[in-house]
Amino acid sequence: MEHPWIPNSHKAILDEMLEAIGVSSVDDLYRDIPPTILLSPEEWDSLPIGEGRPLSEAEVLARINDILSRNKYFTDPPPFVGGGVWPRYVPSVVKALITRGEFLTAYTPYQAEISQGLMQALFEYQSLVAELLEMEVVNASLYDWSSAVGEAMLMARRVTRRNRVLVPETMNPLHLETATTYAYGGGIRVEKVRVDRETGFIDLEDLESRLSQGDTAALYMEYPSSYTGVIDENVEAAGEAVHKAGGLFILGVEPVSMAILKPPGRLGADIAVGDGQPLGLGLNYGGPYLGVFAVRWDGRLVRQMPGRLIGMTVDAEGRRAFAMILQTREQHIRRAKATSNITTNEALMAIAAAVYLSLLGPQGLREVAEASWYMSHYAAKRLSELRGVEAPLLEGEFIMDFTVRLPMDAGVARRRLLEKGVLAGIPLGGFSFFSDNDMLLTVTEAHTRRHVDLLVNLLDSVLGG
């Protein structure tokens, strides 16, 4: 029987469709799905949809709003949580511009003749990020930071023809999990390098020992670390060491921090990756975010880059024009021999980042980074005044993320703060060398002194102060 809410479920229509594709029944289409989780046609009528009747638009909206009302929102104060994405203030103009019809698509502008505006916006994104990172070539986006790390590892293997990548033991576990999945498919071994327990800096002696084995394709580091917050002062020495050993240096960065830190181009990075989320994308459960990927000017590297590249040229009449370039690297040309299987990407998010960077300019971005530094250090100072709290735990300098040691289990403290309306930190128990009492806290320009004081006072009460 035809189901009122499932299109093309009438038997005559189904039979015609099945005959056209050469199968005898709907079951043939789902043969690979375990029968225990498959909904049979006989069960369609029992689907818990609506009120036993079609709903009006107003009724549907009321139902959706009821469901959404169960969500918890953290705006005052914003969450004190980072770990790879961060609470940032997003100017209203960003959403206003990227929701224009000219931009509102995630699809690739293959037909350059009718996509000049979109392509120019992506070219501007590439140019702005290249200036920020001081790297010569930037692609038009990957999915997120994790996928960018994975692609960088695969690229390093192709360039060096080696199959081992070194990472610090405090590498963001979410980035590591995804990157390791990419690496496994490429036959790459990911190996951890020791980190100093006091400073959070990479251990140069352990790094040199591992590099001496001679099969290292790349070293990956984060600057600052997205899971400890530490700005590693050994980063340049580590980069020089891996270059001396014949490997590539991959540096993961938080882009706003680059307004006040030495950028990867000046730190000797061959490949720079990161997430554009802080550049006007806000916080969303699962995204969409923006994978940043850049390389220095080297033909070996550029030819092995993943993802779209937008270039500027002139048309047959001498007018400035934009087009996708070096497409022979890509899947729609090379298929299985492409540098990556990414095609359609996060172009809309890249345009959002371009709007944000254009709006703030160099001075505005610097002010955001400085405000984050000030607020996070204010928070660390206030927290250190609480009895039994050590903040920051690691000695290395930080900008917005920092580790804290509490006199109680960090997971328990986090749950109790959540009950009081504050989402605070990431418990670090079980991660690297941290204990169950350790937590990663994040404070950015989106927080005020009032927000920090509220956190400190509530934590004091949770700790029994």
From Swiss-Prot:
Domain of life of the native organism: Archaea
Enzyme class: oxidoreductase
Catalytic reaction list: N(6)-[(R)-lipoyl]-L-lysyl-[glycine-cleavage complex H protein] + glycine + H(+) = N(6)-[(R)-S(8)-aminomethyldihydrolipoyl]-L-lysyl-[glycine-cleavage complex H protein] + CO2
Documented EC number(s): 1.4.4.2
Cell inner membrane among keywords: no
Keywords: Oxidoreductase
GO molecular function, one term: glycine dehydrogenase (decarboxylating) activity
Listed GO biological process terms: glycine decarboxylation via glycine cleavage system; nucleoside metabolic process
Family: Belongs to the GcvP family. N-terminal subunit subfamily.
Subunit structure comment from the entry: The glycine cleavage system is composed of four proteins: P, T, L and H. In this organism, the P 'protein' is a heterodimer of two subunits.
Function (record text): The glycine cleavage system catalyzes the degradation of glycine. The P protein binds the alpha-amino group of glycine through its pyridoxal phosphate cofactor; CO(2) is released and the remaining methylamine moiety is then transferred to the lipoamide cofactor of the H protein.
Name listed for the protein in its UniProt record: Probable glycine dehydrogenase (decarboxylating) subunit 1
